């Protein structure tokens, strides 16, 4: 890496080639693990025990959450009259940070999360008010294909997130196509699920100023 510190990033073997190559270009060693992000997490913990390297959780970490919370600050800085924010949810790091930042400054702003129907770990946890781990997940939105939400992120979502909804694979695909055709943007599945939730009227946002 830039500071000459060795880093190993564990990813599921189905991770997009672009993500793998971009990570390598920044100086990291990439370890591809068969399965999901949860399997990659388990491999990272195993490597930490073997090597003594420092383990950094991809989402259930206070500093990671704080860093992602700066997105919420930027949103409020650019759109101070905002009504709502819609955030993709996997393990919950991004939405935890964004929700904490926004609710700390503008508690009236709604913060909504969106998960894939095939990987609804945080959705189930919040709606059943009980931390949930899924046995299996299935979605092409690899960035949010998570069986186990973070324990810290679950607590933060319980306190600061107004609601989480799910979208189907077809709805996500339609959102990707809409972004490409209408906005000339190429989005991955994880980035398109908030748009899918808006397009298919999953949330009470009509007439609102929404990010």
Model regions: which residues?
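PLP-dependent amino-acid enzyme catalytic core
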Residues: 1-211
């Amino acid at each position: 890496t830039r500071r000459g510190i060795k880093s190993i990033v564990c990813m599921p073997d189905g991770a997009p080639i672009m993500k793998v190559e971009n990570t390598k270009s920044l100086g990291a060693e990439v370890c591809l693990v068969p399965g999901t992000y949860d399997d990659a997490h388990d491999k990272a913990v195993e490597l930490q025990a073997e090597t003594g390297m420092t383990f950094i959780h991809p989402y259930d970490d206070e500093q990671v959450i704080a860093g992602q919370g700066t997105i919420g600050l930027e949103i409020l800085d650019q759109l101070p009259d905002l009504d709502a924010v819609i955030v993709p949810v996997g393990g919950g790091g991004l939405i935890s940070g964004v929700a904490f930042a926004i609710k700390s400054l503008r508690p009236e702003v709604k913060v909504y999360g969106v998960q894939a129907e095939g990987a609804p770990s945080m959705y189930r946890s919040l709606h059943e008010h009980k931390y949930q781990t899924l046995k299996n997940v299935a979605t092409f939105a690899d960035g949010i294909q998570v069986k186990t939400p973070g324990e810290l992120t679950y607590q933060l979502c319980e306190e600061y997130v107004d609601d989480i909804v799910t979208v189907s694979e077809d709805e996500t695909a339609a959102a990707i196509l809409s972004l490409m055709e209408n906005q000339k943007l190429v989005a991955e599945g994880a980035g398109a699920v908030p748009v899918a939730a808006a397009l298919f009227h999953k949330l009470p946002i009509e007439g609102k100023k929404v990010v």
